[in-house]
Protein backbone atom coordinates (compact mmCIF):
# COMPACT_ATOMS: atom_id res chain seq x y z
CA UNK A 1 0.00 0.00 0.00
CA UNK A 2 1.49 3.31 -1.07
CA UNK A 3 1.44 6.41 1.11
CA UNK A 4 -1.32 8.87 0.32
CA UNK A 5 -0.38 12.48 -0.43
CA UNK A 6 -3.88 13.72 0.36
CA UNK A 7 -3.03 14.46 3.97
CA UNK A 8 -0.56 17.07 2.80
CA UNK A 9 -2.86 18.74 0.33
CA UNK A 10 -5.55 19.18 2.98
CA UNK A 11 -3.29 21.27 5.18
CA UNK A 12 -3.44 25.11 5.13
CA UNK A 13 -1.71 26.42 2.04
CA UNK A 14 1.22 28.20 3.72
CA UNK A 15 3.60 28.92 0.84
CA UNK A 16 6.72 31.00 0.57
CA UNK A 17 5.81 34.02 -1.58
CA UNK A 18 7.80 34.64 -4.76
CA UNK A 19 8.33 37.61 -7.06
CA UNK A 20 6.82 35.58 -9.92
CA UNK A 21 3.40 35.05 -8.32
CA UNK A 22 1.65 37.98 -6.71
CA UNK A 23 -1.80 36.38 -6.35
CA UNK A 24 -0.86 35.86 -2.71
CA UNK A 25 1.93 37.40 -0.69
CA UNK A 26 3.11 37.26 2.90
CA UNK A 27 3.13 40.41 5.01
CA UNK A 28 5.14 40.38 8.21
CA UNK A 29 5.96 42.59 11.17
CA UNK A 30 3.61 43.94 13.85
CA UNK A 31 2.59 47.28 12.31
CA UNK A 32 2.20 45.88 8.79
CA UNK A 33 0.05 42.97 9.95
CA UNK A 34 -2.02 45.04 12.38
CA UNK A 35 -2.79 47.64 9.70
CA UNK A 36 -3.72 44.98 7.13
CA UNK A 37 -6.07 43.31 9.61
CA UNK A 38 -7.72 46.70 10.18
CA UNK A 39 -8.16 47.37 6.45
CA UNK A 40 -11.59 46.20 5.28
CA UNK A 41 -10.42 46.39 1.66
CA UNK A 42 -7.61 43.89 2.20
CA UNK A 43 -8.36 40.27 1.24
CA UNK A 44 -6.81 38.05 3.91
CA UNK A 45 -6.34 34.29 3.84
CA UNK A 46 -4.58 33.27 7.04
CA UNK A 47 -2.42 34.40 9.94
CA UNK A 48 0.77 32.86 11.26
CA UNK A 49 1.68 33.99 14.79
CA UNK A 50 3.54 33.19 17.96
CA UNK A 51 1.36 33.11 21.07
CA UNK A 52 2.88 36.30 22.50
CA UNK A 53 2.49 38.25 19.25
CA UNK A 54 -1.08 37.07 18.81
CA UNK A 55 -1.90 38.34 22.29
CA UNK A 56 -0.43 41.75 21.42
CA UNK A 57 -2.78 42.10 18.45
CA UNK A 58 -5.67 42.32 20.88
CA UNK A 59 -9.28 41.75 19.83
CA UNK A 60 -9.35 42.86 16.21
CA UNK A 61 -12.69 42.03 14.58
CA UNK A 62 -11.20 40.10 11.65
CA UNK A 63 -9.39 37.67 13.94
CA UNK A 64 -12.69 36.00 14.85
CA UNK A 65 -13.20 34.33 11.46
CA UNK A 66 -9.61 34.09 10.21
CA UNK A 67 -7.62 30.84 10.04
CA UNK A 68 -4.82 31.27 12.60
CA UNK A 69 -1.81 29.03 13.05
CA UNK A 70 0.10 29.48 16.32
CA UNK A 71 3.73 28.52 15.78
CA UNK A 72 7.19 28.74 17.29
CA UNK A 73 9.51 31.54 16.03
CA UNK A 74 11.68 29.06 14.12
CA UNK A 75 8.74 27.90 12.00
CA UNK A 76 8.53 31.23 10.14
CA UNK A 77 11.51 30.13 8.06
CA UNK A 78 9.18 27.73 6.24
CA UNK A 79 7.21 30.67 4.84
CA UNK A 80 9.45 33.75 4.90
CA UNK A 81 12.95 34.66 3.84
CA UNK A 82 15.42 34.18 6.68
CA UNK A 83 16.19 37.93 6.67
CA UNK A 84 12.55 38.90 7.25
CA UNK A 85 12.09 40.64 10.61
CA UNK A 86 8.65 39.19 11.30
CA UNK A 87 8.22 40.02 15.02
CA UNK A 88 6.22 36.84 15.43
CA UNK A 89 3.55 37.68 12.84
CA UNK A 90 2.97 36.83 9.18
CA UNK A 91 -0.22 37.34 7.19
CA UNK A 92 -1.07 35.77 3.83
CA UNK A 93 -2.97 38.31 1.74
CA UNK A 94 -3.95 39.35 -1.74
CA UNK A 95 -2.11 42.47 -3.00
CA UNK A 96 -4.15 45.66 -2.64
CA UNK A 97 -6.06 46.93 -5.65
CA UNK A 98 -6.38 50.72 -5.63
CA UNK A 99 -8.10 50.80 -9.02
CA UNK A 100 -6.94 52.94 -11.95
CA UNK A 101 -5.18 56.29 -12.01
CA UNK A 102 -8.40 57.87 -13.27
CA UNK A 103 -10.28 56.39 -10.31
CA UNK A 104 -7.68 57.83 -7.96
CA UNK A 105 -7.72 61.31 -9.47
CA UNK A 106 -11.51 61.43 -9.60
CA UNK A 107 -12.14 60.24 -6.05
CA UNK A 108 -9.19 61.36 -3.94
CA UNK A 109 -9.07 64.66 -2.13
CA UNK A 110 -6.77 66.78 -4.34
CA UNK A 111 -5.26 68.50 -1.31
CA UNK A 112 -1.70 67.25 -0.94
CA UNK A 113 0.97 66.45 -3.53
CA UNK A 114 1.40 63.26 -5.52
CA UNK A 115 4.78 61.52 -5.52
CA UNK A 116 5.91 59.81 -8.74
CA UNK A 117 8.84 57.39 -8.64
CA UNK A 118 10.91 57.05 -11.82
CA UNK A 119 12.60 53.63 -11.66
CA UNK A 120 12.92 53.41 -7.89
CA UNK A 121 13.28 49.66 -7.41
CA UNK A 122 14.39 49.27 -3.80
CA UNK A 123 11.38 48.17 -1.69
CA UNK A 124 12.83 49.68 1.48
CA UNK A 125 13.00 53.11 -0.16
CA UNK A 126 9.51 52.83 -1.64
CA UNK A 127 8.07 51.73 1.70
CA UNK A 128 9.77 54.62 3.50
CA UNK A 129 8.41 57.08 0.91
CA UNK A 130 4.87 55.77 1.41
CA UNK A 131 5.30 56.20 5.16
CA UNK A 132 6.49 59.79 4.68
CA UNK A 133 3.56 60.47 2.36
CA UNK A 134 1.09 59.51 5.07
CA UNK A 135 2.82 61.50 7.81
CA UNK A 136 3.44 64.60 5.67
CA UNK A 137 0.23 64.77 3.66
CA UNK A 138 1.07 63.12 0.34
CA UNK A 139 -2.00 62.18 -1.68
CA UNK A 140 -0.56 59.04 -3.33
CA UNK A 141 2.65 57.38 -4.52
CA UNK A 142 2.82 56.30 -8.16
CA UNK A 143 5.44 54.36 -10.10
CA UNK A 144 6.24 52.34 -13.20
CA UNK A 145 4.81 48.82 -13.49
CA UNK A 146 8.04 47.36 -14.86
CA UNK A 147 10.65 49.54 -13.19
CA UNK A 148 9.44 50.20 -9.64
CA UNK A 149 9.20 47.96 -6.60
CA UNK A 150 6.12 45.75 -6.41
CA UNK A 151 4.12 45.12 -3.27
CA UNK A 152 6.09 42.68 -1.12
CA UNK A 153 6.28 41.93 2.57
CA UNK A 154 9.51 43.91 2.88
CA UNK A 155 8.03 46.97 1.18
CA UNK A 156 4.87 46.90 3.30
CA UNK A 157 6.88 46.49 6.51
CA UNK A 158 9.07 49.47 5.57
CA UNK A 159 5.87 51.52 5.23
CA UNK A 160 5.03 50.64 8.86
CA UNK A 161 1.26 50.42 8.35
CA UNK A 162 0.95 53.34 5.93
CA UNK A 163 0.68 51.01 2.92
CA UNK A 164 -2.94 50.24 3.85
CA UNK A 165 -3.90 53.92 3.78
CA UNK A 166 -1.79 55.66 1.10
CA UNK A 167 -2.59 54.62 -2.49
CA UNK A 168 0.38 53.01 -4.27
CA UNK A 169 -0.29 52.45 -7.96
CA UNK A 170 1.95 51.52 -10.85
CA UNK A 171 1.37 52.35 -14.51
CA UNK A 172 2.95 51.03 -17.73
CA UNK A 173 4.05 54.44 -18.98
CA UNK A 174 5.33 57.31 -16.82
CA UNK A 175 5.15 59.76 -19.74
CA UNK A 176 1.45 59.04 -20.22
CA UNK A 177 0.93 59.42 -16.47
CA UNK A 178 2.50 62.88 -16.60
CA UNK A 179 0.21 63.84 -19.48
CA UNK A 180 -2.82 62.66 -17.49
CA UNK A 181 -1.78 64.71 -14.48
CA UNK A 182 -1.22 67.78 -16.64
CA UNK A 183 -4.73 67.37 -18.03
CA UNK A 184 -5.92 67.47 -14.42
CA UNK A 185 -4.00 70.75 -13.94
CA UNK A 186 -1.14 69.35 -11.90
CA UNK A 187 2.20 71.15 -11.99
CA UNK A 188 4.97 68.60 -12.55
CA UNK A 189 8.10 69.20 -10.47
CA UNK A 190 11.18 67.03 -10.97
CA UNK A 191 13.81 66.67 -8.25
CA UNK A 192 17.27 66.73 -9.79
CA UNK A 193 20.72 67.93 -8.62
CA UNK A 194 21.04 69.90 -11.87
CA UNK A 195 17.84 71.86 -11.22
CA UNK A 196 18.35 75.60 -11.56
CA UNK A 197 15.73 76.43 -8.92
CA UNK A 198 15.80 75.66 -5.20
CA UNK A 199 12.81 73.58 -4.08
CA UNK A 200 11.62 75.97 -1.37
CA UNK A 201 11.86 79.01 -3.67
CA UNK A 202 9.63 77.33 -6.25
CA UNK A 203 7.08 76.14 -3.70
CA UNK A 204 6.57 79.67 -2.44
CA UNK A 205 5.38 80.63 -5.93
CA UNK A 206 3.01 77.66 -6.32
CA UNK A 207 0.61 78.19 -3.45
CA UNK A 208 -2.80 76.51 -3.80
CA UNK A 209 -1.75 74.58 -6.91
CA UNK A 210 -1.91 70.84 -7.49
CA UNK A 211 1.62 69.44 -7.46
CA UNK A 212 3.18 66.15 -8.54
CA UNK A 213 6.80 65.58 -7.54
CA UNK A 214 8.96 63.17 -9.53
CA UNK A 215 11.98 61.49 -7.96
CA UNK A 216 14.43 59.25 -9.77
CA UNK A 217 16.48 56.28 -8.69
CA UNK A 218 19.67 56.76 -6.73
CA UNK A 219 22.67 56.96 -8.99
CA UNK A 220 20.98 57.55 -12.34
CA UNK A 221 18.32 59.98 -11.10
CA UNK A 222 15.57 61.13 -13.46
CA UNK A 223 15.71 59.89 -17.03
CA UNK A 224 16.30 62.46 -19.77
CA UNK A 225 12.79 62.17 -21.23
CA UNK A 226 11.25 62.46 -17.78
CA UNK A 227 13.16 65.68 -17.17
CA UNK A 228 11.94 67.08 -20.49
CA UNK A 229 8.31 66.57 -19.47
CA UNK A 230 8.61 68.38 -16.13
CA UNK A 231 7.28 71.91 -15.73
CA UNK A 232 10.12 72.64 -13.31
CA UNK A 233 13.39 71.00 -12.27
CA UNK A 234 14.43 71.80 -8.73
CA UNK A 235 17.14 70.81 -6.31
CA UNK A 236 17.21 70.49 -2.55
CA UNK A 237 19.60 72.97 -1.03
CA UNK A 238 22.19 70.88 0.84
CA UNK A 239 25.68 71.37 2.20
CA UNK A 240 28.33 70.87 -0.46
CA UNK A 241 29.74 67.97 1.53
CA UNK A 242 26.41 66.12 1.10
CA UNK A 243 25.11 66.81 -2.38
CA UNK A 244 23.43 63.44 -2.96
CA UNK A 245 20.51 62.33 -0.79
CA UNK A 246 18.94 58.92 -0.43
CA UNK A 247 15.71 59.00 -2.48
CA UNK A 248 13.50 58.30 0.53
CA UNK A 249 15.18 61.13 2.46
CA UNK A 250 14.74 63.44 -0.52
CA UNK A 251 11.05 62.53 -0.70
CA UNK A 252 10.57 63.24 3.01
CA UNK A 253 12.28 66.64 2.73
CA UNK A 254 10.23 67.49 -0.36
CA UNK A 255 6.92 66.56 1.26
CA UNK A 256 7.79 68.46 4.43
CA UNK A 257 8.65 71.55 2.39
CA UNK A 258 5.40 71.22 0.44
CA UNK A 259 3.41 71.05 3.67
CA UNK A 260 5.13 74.16 4.99
CA UNK A 261 5.09 76.37 1.89
CA UNK A 262 2.20 75.35 -0.37
Name each model-derived stretch.
Residues 1-106:
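N-terminal positively charged helical leader segments and presequences
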Residues 22-24, 43-47, 139-141, 165-167, ...:
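Short active-site oxyanion
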Residues 27, 69-73, 167-176, 234:
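Short acidic-hydrophobic, aromatic-tinged amphipathic segments that line or gate anion-handling sites
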Residues 34, 39, 134-135, 156-160, ...:
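Structured adenosyl-cofactor binding patch, chiefly the S-adenosyl-L-methionine
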Residues 52, 73-76, 146-148, 218, ...:
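Short, acidic/turn-prone active-site loops that include or flank metal/cofactor-
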Residues 56, 148-154, 220-229:
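Short, glycine/polar-rich helix-capping loops at beta-to-alpha or helix-loop-helix junctions
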Residues 106-196:
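RNA substrate-binding interface of SAM-dependent RNA methyltransferases
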Residues 118, 189-242, 246:
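Active-site/ligand-binding-proximal alpha/beta "capping" segment
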